[in-house]
Each structure stands twice: as structure tokens, then as C-alpha cells.
Amino acid sequence: MDIKRVTVIVLDGVGIGEAPDADEYGDVGSHSLANTAAAINGLDLPNMAALGLGCISEMQGVACPESFSGSYGKMQPLSKGKDTVSGHWEMMGIVLPTPFPVYPDGFPAAVIEPFKQKIGRGVLGNKSASGTDILEELGMEHIRTGDPIVYTSADSVFQIAAHEDVITPKELYAMCEIAREILVGEHAVGRVIARPFIGDSPETFKRTIRRHDYALTPETPTILDKVVAAGKQVYSVGKIDDIFGNRGISVSNHTVDNAASLEAVLEFLDVDFEGLLFANFIEFDMIYGHRNDPVGYANALKAVDQRLPELQAKLRAGDLVVITADHGVDPTTPGSNHSREYVPLLVFGPEVRSGVNLGTRQTLSDLAATIAEIFGLEQPLHGTSFLSELQ
């Protein structure tokens, strides 16, 4: 088996059961897939089922098949954090020994005061809140005062919300860059996020697609860096470029929804290249998981599942595809935060063995180790390749 292209598709927030340390995060009982299935009386995912999804963990409507089109397993998060950045970095070989800082009581004066001074405005909020709730609470005051809304969550994020007619997206992005410069050292949050919105009342406020993330960059090279350094290509889809600070990426298509992300993946698969295609499908997390909408979550899964045959038809000899996730965000549990869960591992390709139980991998960095072995790169500090099990 001579693999030339690896495609990694991250179903953002699609966890597959509580991790062993879920109690440390308040996430006992979380299971994004199975709990969603139970809430809607069964998932309809025949193509992922054929890959082995139902063999990883029981979930209503998704059985373990008699005939497989892929191999399957699950990966346990090792990094001390359950956020998007930690999950994606770990997949690419960076395990964080300490979590990014969080601010359940809001940001201290050492952060807020210089931020206010540099943007020349006050701020509203400065607390932990749901993104939709805080717009209902403070959106009208923001329109009246012109002050941006600053808030956080259980994740390591500094989020700035602003109405597009009050503070333009360009101005909002500049504020985020200022915040990113301030948030270093002990206050080095994982992400600064621009959250533009529209509407003229609490009932009509709606976040727009012009969200933008400003993530820290890894201190050591990731597999992305190593693939590019070896003279190969890295194509990114969705917010991958933001998550890695545009580092180790040859070409990016910053899509903002699942349908556009899938189209971008299909287009990149038409390109004759050797290297890595890394895509994030955001809607499970951003639109449905955080808003506790299991019906929408299930429908989004079904929409991706229905188009998997199109992706499979694009594959050629030398292709290997991985479908996984970065963390959970169980839409059926109280609260709107991420959940500490295992993530699914589905692997397939024209020359890849099917029906192999890859078991429980001890870190998401097993994916990085596998990519490193495929391309003859230096192995990451963490992770064990599963390539030999697929040959």
C-alpha cells in the first residue's frame, strides 16, 4: 500500500462517549452521538455505519455492519483541555500538558483595561455566557453605546461580538488583533474570536458567517509543518487555517458551513497532489451542539453522510481518508459547552483494509504518527501509528 494523499475530515464536536477523565470536566454521561440518537429516536447514517461507526459504540439506528467499507476505532484525548485548538493540535502531534487559561468570572483588569484603552471604547459583558444569550441581553445596549460585547465560555476563548452596522467586520477584526497581542503569558487564551451579528431586536439578532478566529500558534512544529517542509502539499478547508495560525498550509479555502466545506474537499480531491488535505466541518459544534439542538445536529450528520459516496467516488489508488472529531459537544446535556469525550476514528480508501477494529487509541496524536509514517517524516513525541493494521 503506497499512500500518496491523506484526507482528514474533522466533524467538529462529534464525540463518541465520555472519556475516562470526563468527571474532571463535569462531563460524566456525555455521548454526543448516542444521546442525540436517543433524543430523536435513531440516527440515519448508512454510509458511516458501513465504515464501522456503530461498532465503536452503541447508538440507536446505527448498527455494526456485516460487510464493511472501512475500518474503525476511537481516540482518547490526552491534552489537558477539551477545546477546538487542543483537539486539532493533538491530532497533528502536539499534546498540551496544561490547559489554556479559562475565565469563568470574566477577564481581569490587567486584560480589559489595556484592551479598552487601545480600542478607544468601553466594553460590555466581560463574563462567561452563551453567545446567543448575551446578544439578547446586551445587543441593544451595544447598538446604543457602540461598545463591543466581550464574553467567554468554559473554553479558553476571548470573544468579541459586534453588530455589523455599529462596528464593521473589518473594525472588529482589528479589535481581535489587539486582544490577541494583549492575551499572552499567563493570559494566553487558545483563541480570540470575532462574532459579528445582525438584526434590530433581541428576537432578530443573529450571528453572521463572518466569524474569524485568532488562535495561538504551536511552539513546536506540527505534522502540517513537517509535510510542507518535506516538499509536499497541505490543503486546508474550513477554520483549519485559523486553528494553526496559517502555518504549515499550502492552500486554504476558509469555508464557513458544512456544505461549502464538503464541496471544497471534493474540489481538492480533483487536484493531483501528494500530501495532506485537512478539513473542519463546523456546524455540529457552532450551530447545533452549543445551542442544544439534537434534531439539527442529527440532520447535519445525515447531510454529510448522504454525500460520502460522492467523496468515495473521487478517491484513487494511494488515497487514505480519516473521519474523526476534535471533542464532543453533546446537544442533549445541560449547558452549552464542549464535552470531554472519545472521538470516532473511521478510516477508508481504495487500498485500505476494511473491517479492522483499530481499538481505543490512547491519544489523538496516533493520527499524527500515522501520517508521519505514511510520508516518511520524523515521528511526533506522542502517538503510535496504526498504518500497519490497515495494510
Curated annotation (Swiss-Prot):
<dbReference type="InterPro" id="IPR010045">
    <property type="entry name" value="DeoB"/>
</dbReference>
<dbReference type="GO" id="GO:0000287">
    <property type="term" value="F:magnesium ion binding"/>
</dbReference>
<feature type="binding site">
    <location>
        <position position="290"/>
    </location>
    <ligand>
        <name>Mn(2+) 2</name>
    </ligand>
</feature>
<feature type="binding site">
    <location>
        <position position="326"/>
    </location>
    <ligand>
        <name>Mn(2+) 1</name>
    </ligand>
</feature>
<keyword id="KW-0464">Manganese</keyword>
<keyword id="KW-0963">Cytoplasm</keyword>
<feature type="binding site">
    <location>
        <position position="12"/>
    </location>
    <ligand>
        <name>Mn(2+) 1</name>
    </ligand>
</feature>
<dbReference type="GO" id="GO:0043094">
    <property type="term" value="P:metabolic compound salvage"/>
</dbReference>
<dbReference type="InterPro" id="IPR006124">
    <property type="entry name" value="Metalloenzyme"/>
</dbReference>
<comment type="pathway">
    <text>Carbohydrate degradation; 2-deoxy-D-ribose 1-phosphate degradation; D-glyceraldehyde 3-phosphate and acetaldehyde from 2-deoxy-alpha-D-ribose 1-phosphate: step 1/2.</text>
</comment>
<dbReference type="GO" id="GO:0008973">
    <property type="term" value="F:phosphopentomutase activity"/>
</dbReference>
<dbReference type="InterPro" id="IPR017850">
    <property type="entry name" value="Alkaline_phosphatase_core_sf"/>
</dbReference>
<dbReference type="InterPro" id="IPR024052">
    <property type="entry name" value="Phosphopentomutase_DeoB_cap_sf"/>
</dbReference>
<keyword id="KW-0479">Metal-binding</keyword>
<dbReference type="Pfam" id="PF01676">
    <property type="entry name" value="Metalloenzyme"/>
</dbReference>
<dbReference type="GO" id="GO:0006015">
    <property type="term" value="P:5-phosphoribose 1-diphosphate biosynthetic process"/>
</dbReference>
<feature type="binding site">
    <location>
        <position position="327"/>
    </location>
    <ligand>
        <name>Mn(2+) 1</name>
    </ligand>
</feature>
<comment type="similarity">
    <text>Belongs to the phosphopentomutase family.</text>
</comment>
<feature type="binding site">
    <location>
        <position position="338"/>
    </location>
    <ligand>
        <name>Mn(2+) 2</name>
    </ligand>
</feature>
<dbReference type="GO" id="GO:0005829">
    <property type="term" value="C:cytosol"/>
</dbReference>
<dbReference type="GO" id="GO:0030145">
    <property type="term" value="F:manganese ion binding"/>
</dbReference>
<dbReference type="GO" id="GO:0006018">
    <property type="term" value="P:2-deoxyribose 1-phosphate catabolic process"/>
</dbReference>
<protein>
    <recommendedName>
        <fullName>Phosphopentomutase</fullName>
        <ecNumber>5.4.2.7</ecNumber>
    </recommendedName>
</protein>
<comment type="function">
    <text>Isomerase that catalyzes the conversion of deoxy-ribose 1-phosphate (dRib-1-P) and ribose 1-phosphate (Rib-1-P) to deoxy-ribose 5-phosphate (dRib-5-P) and ribose 5-phosphate (Rib-5-P), respectively.</text>
</comment>
<dbReference type="GO" id="GO:0009117">
    <property type="term" value="P:nucleotide metabolic process"/>
</dbReference>
<feature type="binding site">
    <location>
        <position position="285"/>
    </location>
    <ligand>
        <name>Mn(2+) 2</name>
    </ligand>
</feature>
<keyword id="KW-0413">Isomerase</keyword>
